[in-house]
């Protein structure tokens, strides 16, 4: 209701102007976790390497190398004109969840899929194996 807007704004300002003291202490402690952060960085680097080699081996040859996040975008216009249906087909046939490009681009998204490598390295290797098997069967079928 309009008469509550200013009251809610005042309450919300307390969350945005300055984070609570406990959150500030936790953030400082997180900056001291150098070994853990480096271990995570190494996992992401290995997962990225696996994706950049494994996706083309599976048939996804038009990929945009990730630069700042743990996602690989693949142009699948040579494989489909419906990324939503293709993502569902991959989930059903390979048991691998990918995201249709329409979630990010309403104009050209039907031609793109997004692959995440924010999982364990074993999960990434298994997912790529499943994608290879699925795509080989799809090409033969």
Residue ranges and their predicted role:
Residues 1-141:
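PLP-dependent class I/II
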């Amino acid at each position: 209701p309009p008469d509550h807007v200013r009251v809610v704004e005042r309450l919300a300002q307390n969350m945005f102007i300055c984070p609570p003291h406990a959150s500030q202490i936790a953030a400082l402690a997180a900056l001291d976790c150098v070994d853990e952060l480096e271990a995570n960085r190494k996992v992401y680097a290995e997962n990225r390497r696996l994706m950049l080699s494994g996706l083309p081996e599976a048939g996804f040859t038009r990929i945009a190398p990730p630069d700042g996040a743990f996602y690989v975008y693949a142009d699948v216009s040579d494989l489909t004109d419906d990324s939503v249906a293709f993502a569902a087909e991959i989930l059903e046939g390979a048991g691998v969840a990918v995201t249709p490009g329409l979630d990010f681009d309403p104009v050209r998204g039907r031609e793109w899929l997004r692959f995440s490598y924010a999982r364990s390295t074993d999960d990434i290797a298994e997912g790529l194996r499943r994608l290879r098997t699925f795509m080989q069967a799809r090409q033969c079928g």
